[in-house]
Amino acid sequence: KDSLSFSDGYPILLASEESLEDLNSRLKEAIPMKRFRPNVVVRGAGAFSEDRWKEFQINDIKMYGVKRCCRCKIPTTNQLTAERSNEPTKTLETYRKGKVKTSGVFFGQNVIHEQRNWFSETFLSRRTISIGDPVRVLNEGEIPETSKSKKN
């Protein structure tokens, strides 16, 4: 059985620099991307375009968008001072609120990657992602706010 440890429900959080730039343009004080804790950050597709990526590929790794990421309170904490505020949640509520999960705000997308067998993982593919690697969007469409396979 596949399992997941030390993550917040999904192994990958995807966000774009343009999405953060859009958010920061609405805030009194800009915040860094690290507040959202993404492990894949892209640039060049436009603000919140990652919301619609059903399938994309980096090197030989196919990834699948599962659901938009409903944000907890962690991004409201300044990681340098440990001080909390109501931002960025308050601003996200003005334009990134859910339709189904109306109590939440969304930033980024929860993503899973394609599973392969040991041989192809070891010998046949480039399974490392590095800064600057190109991203190829294979399929776009509506991504749900919630997942039927996970509790939210």
Where are these regions (language model features)?
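Metal-cofactor-dependent catalytic cores
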Residues: 1-152
